[in-house]
Amino acid sequence: MEDPDICWVQRFSNFERTFLLLSKALEFESPSVIERAGLIHFFEMAFELSWNLLEDYEEQEGITAKTPREVIKQAYQAELISRGHDWMNALQDRNLMAHTYSKKTAIAVEAKIRHEYFPLLDELYRLFKTKLEATK
């Protein structure tokens, strides 16, 4: 069986790459339709990897949660994340954008990514970057 430590470290590496791409995509202040679609896609990927990262870390800590909602709730209770309600909103918007597309919704979600969801992912990134440094 794979060492759980290795599992979350590998997941963090994948999350970090996608998070940094999302960060770059956010540099476009007035994105075109294509740039906005890319930004939303990077958010979807980063969000998916964020809850997978939390799931791997929680498993290492002896916490069992399998759905994104359960993982987020457990992470909030364990104080790995703050603003649990905002994480749940991000999950809802990620699911919405994965299954539907409208320009109006895309613009609204882009604004939420910029002002609400990216800061959540940034906080998670910084936490796990620190945890990774502590393992070296």
Predicted regions and their residues:
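Solvent-exposed interaction patches of small proteins and small membrane subunits
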Residues: M1-K136
